Design a protein with these regions (language model features):
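Start-transfer (signal-anchor) and selected internal transmembrane alpha helices
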Residues: 1-50, 59, 155, 298-329, ...
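Extracytoplasmic
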Residues: 2-17, 35-38, 56, 61, ...
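Transmembrane signal-anchor helices characteristic of membrane glycosylation enzymes that use polyprenol
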Residues: 21-61, 66-67, 73-80, 89, ...
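Membrane-embedded helix bundles of polyisoprenyl
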Residues: 37-41, 84-87, 128-147, 152-239, ...
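Short hydrophobic/aromatic helix or loop-helix immediately within or flanking a transmembrane segment
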Residues: 63, 67-71, 85-119, 215
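Loop-to-helix entry region of an early transmembrane alpha helix in multi-pass inner-membrane enzymes
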Residues: 92-106, 115-139, 172-176, 180
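Alpha-helical transmembrane segments at the extracellular/periplasmic loop-to-helix junctions
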Residues: 287-304, 321-401
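Hydrophobic/aromatic-rich transmembrane helices and adjacent perimembrane loops
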Residues: 383, 402, 407-445
Length: 791
């Protein structure tokens, strides 16, 4: 007996030691996997900095840098008192503390103080900041998933976080904005709140709310996170009621839920109230409706359960089921009413009701609807695993993730930018699904191969995003982006050549660049806080020349106007000559006395895309939405509103609409139909391209592709443009090489030509500048940015 007892004890000790060894080994594997994931994540996020340079990316991050610098110089207190910045939204100025929130500035400064001993200044620190915090998200995602799933799923979540395209898109070095920090904090806060359901609800409730509370100081999408926590509380209460109906425990402590959620409700309210942008009045807004319902539900259910027990609680709630159902219907029905009275508006309304979008909201690329192609590029390789995870998310601790996944997927469809918001839920669900499928031995190898293939494809998608250059490097071009120093050259010129207090009018996309890099007051920027001023700028650009000049000089009090339009010269590509798209030869136009087509170089607007010509559609739409028939107060006829609303008055927008067409090969070009507006006069007059003659002079006269081919009469000296079909006939271009179909020109040719209003019929100037508008700057190297002075 004693011998047997000793033997059993020895075996137990050996088993315990073996288990301890396995645990230690597994801990080492997990630690190594997390370290490798973090290293890979940081490398991916900093690669574009190493390759393209230490640039702050896009537009919004520049104001974040500017305000971080201001905070470093003046302290944090101005965020809670306000400060006036006269160089933005000239001539009115703006108080940024009431428009933006301090979180981004603060996390940038945290990295600055960390790296300052190593010689980093603030600029370089804020370039590193988003990459560092976003890479650290591999640890918070591991923690989040480990709260409701096993460690294998948590490690997979960390790995997916390192390479996920949606994490990378707004987590690169230089993308100093709100998303990078939110993707780090949101899973941390949610994980801590889930932990609060299990133990120590006060401690974990405070920690979780602090993490999510800082999101309220960082990103406007905090309204979603705020309501997500409230909705998750409601879902957990509903789950508890269903379990009570079955006579079983809910599987979590309703006491812990009541305590932790009450802490969340009031502590988050403190974060929300502290900043000037929101303030205490936000707690009385519609955005606090679901969180307040959550508070009533969790506290009410806990008190009911504590007093009368599970079974009687269920019977009591069953009596009032119709009241609860009616409340849900009432909330849904109230949304359009609240939208009508502007209680919910702007991009927040566009998220809830995608069809309730103003022209300004629609004009922002990241507020457009998501597409199937974009969603595949973001999550395609892991969608099967996300679907496979859903049965595993029915446990109480995973219900917040399921709620996040369902609601986040809806918001991601309504706006492209919100594909990023759902990233933690999508990555966590994919990791859980992958781990669950790998447990099925029958499909083990097949699932493993599928997982490896998905990870490889995910990595390829992420790497493609990681290698793309910053917006300032490609001068804000797209489709495809082309590296160019045009905007950098233009901003340096503004900073050094314009009078010190000269304001510059521009479309709102470039306002931050003009003020922060160009050091000159701008009239509008990406904050889009003054729709009337944006509408006025749009109206000035899309009005007849003299009216537009008067609006800029008298109403907006500026005398410098910047415009941006990328364009390509086809004579730079020898292969296009065979298609008649450029020629260094003189071509006699048949037997017409003295008429010859001259050597020419064809210019194509908006290739690469991204300029003001494309955006002019939205300039007109916003101007019409802001003013309508009130354009009459600017000296325009009231009927001009109809002209603004109808793109065929000035702009050919697409192939599905009835109207003129212009096709090169199989590519439809967007072309102007009216050169009499101020913007089109600025963009398409030939003075802006004369500088290129030193490069392209062997090819003859530059000509916009929609104008036709320049021709002159050697006897009379008359000049004109001839339609492309006329040129093809006399230049003997083979039919298979006649790639231009349709034509816009000065002289209508039945069935082929569509006349352009304002196109010069007796010269090669296309359109001429008025005497009170002077071209003072053309950017290098491509001439994409121009600045005019109103004299």
């Amino acid at each position: 007996m004693a011998l047997t007892g000793k033997s059993s004890s020895a075996q137990g000790a050996q088993t315990s030691a073996s288990a301890g060894g396995r645990d230690l080994l597994w801990t080492g594997v997990v630690a190594s996997a997390l370290a490798a994931s973090f290293a890979m994540a940081l490398y991916f996020r900093m690669y574009r900095v190493f390759y393209w340079g230490w640039w702050i990316d896009e537009f919004d991050p520049y104001i974040r840098y500017y305000l971080a610098l201001y905070t470093l110089q003046h302290g944090i207190s101005w965020w809670f008192k306000g400060a006036y910045f006269p160089d933005f939204w000239y001539p009115w100025g703006v108080d940024w503390a009431r428009v933006l929130i301090p979180g981004v500035s603060l996390y940038g400064l945290s990295v600055y103080f960390l790296l300052r001993p190593f010689g980093f200044d603030l600029w370089h620190a804020v370039v590193v900041a988003p990459a560092l915090y976003n890479a650290l998200a591999v640890f918070t995602m591991y923690y989040f998933v480990s709260r409701f799933s096993d460690k294998k799923a948590a490690v997979l979540a960390a790995l997916l976080t390192a390479i996920a395209p949606t994490y990378l898109q707004r987590g690169f070095g230089g993308w100093f904005d709100d998303e990078a920090l939110t993707l780090f904090l949101a899973p941390l806060g949610l994980g801590l709140l889930i932990e609060a359901l299990k133990k120590r609800p006060v401690l974990y409730g405070v920690l979780g709310t602090t993490a999510i509370g800082f999101v309220a100081w960082t990103w406007g999408a905090q309204f979603y996170i705020w309501n997500l926590v409230g909705l998750s509380a409601l879902v957990l209460v509903a789950y508890a009621v269903l379990r009570a109906a079955q006579g079983t425990s809910p599987g979590f402590s309703t006491r812990n839920l009541a305590i932790s959620y009450t802490i969340f409700y009031f502590l988050f309210a403190a974060f929300e109230s502290a900043v000037l942008r929101y303030g205490p009045h936000m707690l009385r807004s519609i955005y606090n409706f679901i969180p307040t319902l959550g508070l009533l539900a969790v506290v009410g259910y806990y008190l009911l359960e504590a007093r009368v027990g599970l079974a009687r609680s269920y019977r009591f709630l069953k009596r009032f089921a119709w009241v609860i159902a009616a409340a849900v219907v009432l909330v849904a029905a109230s949304i359009p009413v609240l939208a009508y009275f502007h209680v919910i508006s702007g991009k927040f309304l566009a998220t809830i009701l995608p069809f309730g979008r103003s022209a300004i909201v629609q004009s922002v690329a990241e507020h457009t609807y998501s597409t199937f192609q974009l969603e595949l590029g973001s999550y395609g390789p892991v969608i099967p695993f996300i679907i496979a995870s859903i049965p595993s998310l029915a446990s109480p601790y995973a219900l917040p993730l399921l709620t996040y996944l369902v609601t986040g997927s809806y918001t991601a469809v309504t706006q492209v930018r919100l594909l990023i918001l759902v990233a933690p839920a999508a990555v966590a669900a994919a990791a859980v699904g992958m781990a669950q499928l790998l447990k099925i031995r029958r499909f083990g190898w097949a699932v493993a191969l599928m997982a490896i293939a998905s990870l490889a494809l995910f990595t390829a998608l992420g790497w493609g995003t990681a290698t793309s250059p910053q917006q300032i490097v490609v001068s804000a071009t797209a489709g495809p982006s082309v590296p160019s120093a045009d905007w950098l050259d233009a901003l340096m010129w503004m900073a050094t050549r314009l009078p010190p207090n000269a304001s510059v009018a521009e479309w709102w996309d470039y306002g931050y660049w003009v003020t922060i890099l160009g050091h000159r007051p701008s009239l509008a920027d990406n904050s889009t806080i003054n729709s009337t001023q944006i509408g006025t700028i749009g109206l000035a650009f899309m009005s007849p020349v003299e009216t537009g000049i008067n609006i800029f000089s008298k109403d907006l009090k500026t005398h410098y106007i910047a415009a941006f339009m990328p364009w390509s010269a086809l004579c730079a590509y020898p292969g296009y000559s065979q298609f008649g798209l450029w020629s260094s030869q003189i071509v006699q136009l048949g037997n017409a006395t003295g008429w010859f087509a001259l050597p020419f170089c064809t210019l194509v607007p908006e290739i690469p895309a991204g300029g003001d010509f494309l955006k002019s559609y939205w300039m007109a739409q916003i101007a019409n939405q802001v003013y309508g028939t009130d354009v009459a107060k600017f000296g325009l006829p009231a009927s001009y509103a109809q002209h603004l609303a109808n793109p065929f008055g000035y702009f050919f927008t697409g192939t599905s609409q009835i109207g003129p067409y212009f096709v090169v090969g199989n590519q439809f070009l967007i072309v102007p139909l009216n050169l009499t507006t101020l913007l089109y006069t600025m963009l398409f007059n030939m003075e802006r391209v004369y500088w290129m003659w030193t490069t392209y002079s062997p090819y003859g006269y530059p000509t916009w592709i929609f104008a036709g081919v320049p021709a002159a009469n050697i006897l009379t000296g008359n000049e004109t443009y001839v339609p492309w079909d006329v040129y093809y006939a006399y230049a003997k271009i083979p039919p298979q090489n006649q790639v231009i179909l349709g034509s816009l020109c000065t002289v209508s040719s039945a069935g082929f030509c569509y006349p352009i209003a304002g196109l010069n019929a007796t010269g090669f100037a296309a359109t001429s500048l008025p005497p009170n508008l002077r071209l003072v700057y053309v950017s290098k190297p491509y001439g994409w940015v121009v600045v005019y002075q109103i004299t």
